Amino acid sequence: MDPGKDKEGVPQPSGPPARKKFVIPLDEDEVPPGVAKPLFRSTQSLPTVDTSAQAAPQTYAEYAISQPLEGAGATCPTGSEPLAGETPNQALKPGAKSNSIIVSPRQRGNPVLKFVRNVPWEFGDVIPDYVLGQSTCALFLSLRYHNLHPDYIHGRLQSLGKNFALRVLLVQVDVKDPQQALKELAKMCILADCTLILAWSPEEAGRYLETYKAYEQKPADLLMEKLEQDFVSRVTECLTTVKSVNKTDSQTLLTTFGSLEQLIAASREDLALCPGLGPQKARRLFDVLHEPFLKVP
């Protein structure tokens, strides 16, 4: 058999067979960077993805500053969007009851949330950062972020309006010299009718949020003055309203004269003889006890 011919006697070209060329069209713009890897090396260089910029900051200030600003100083982190399978609650209207602290999605990633452990909390579509009750809300502000974006808190307060009776500005002091910034914030809170609370750590800020929510339904008895109902306590409270007369002087007078009637009937000299009273206190007490009552028309 002739090596230059095939089985049918057709002459074949000398040398190795020629390779067929295939052209695969590849649109470089349709390949998302970092998702699909091209099968063939292209002369067009793809943009590199900086993975270091996607790392989550350690503090809330770094977390908020690293996000792009929207509008006039407003920050809404890109991580505030609902995750897959997570549906934020609808907006909680002022006056609506809830057993949980309603947290705005813009606070996602705030280290303060790690220390809110004693009361439940959940994300919801609300205007303030935290809704602590039917008429109580809170805005969170880092002093480090405030120094870089001083107009941010003004816009937040304007958007908040008068929807809540008690509005708390919870400030985390995370700078070395906070005096000037705190002075400006204190003045702003007075004009905006807000309550300014300072926290020196995320843990302390979390405790403030927990306390506001835990005491939402409790009465104000702990803050009110407790008045004793017994006779001695009521007489002591009455006598101590006289200038320079203290509780010790009141007990001395009651022990010396025995009753309020005899105390009123005593002369100025008798009052001055009481130990620890003196002529000046005796004169003031005598004048008060013998002044005529004012008639209210």
UniProtKB/Swiss-Prot annotation:
Keywords for the protein's UniProt record, in alphabetical order: Acetylation, Cataract, Cytoplasm, DNA damage, DNA repair, DNA-binding, Isopeptide bond, Nucleus, Ubl conjugation
A Pfam family the protein falls into: HHH_5
Post-translational changes noted in the entry: Ubiquitinated with both 'Lys-48' and 'Lys-63' linkages. Deubiquitinated by USP45.
GO terms assigned for molecular function: damaged DNA binding; promoter-specific chromatin binding; single-stranded DNA binding; TFIID-class transcription factor complex binding
Start and end residues of each stretch annotated as HhH2, dimerization with ERCC4/XPF: 220-297
Keyword Ubl conjugation listed: yes
Keyword Iron-sulfur part of the UniProt annotation: no
Positions of the DNA-binding region: 134-156
GO cellular component, one term: ERCC4-ERCC1 complex
Effect upon mutating L223A: Impaired interaction with ERCC4
Highest taxon, organism lineage: Eukaryota
N-acetylmethionine modified-residue sites: M1
Motif (Nuclear localization signal): 17-23
Effect of E225A: Impaired interaction with ERCC4
Disease per UniProt entry: Cerebro-oculo-facio-skeletal syndrome 4: A disorder of prenatal onset characterized by microcephaly, congenital cataracts, facial dysmorphism, neurogenic arthrogryposis, growth failure and severe psychomotor retardation. COFS is considered to be part of the nucleotide-excision repair disorders spectrum that include also xeroderma pigmentosum, trichothiodystrophy and Cockayne syndrome.
Protein name: DNA excision repair protein ERCC-1
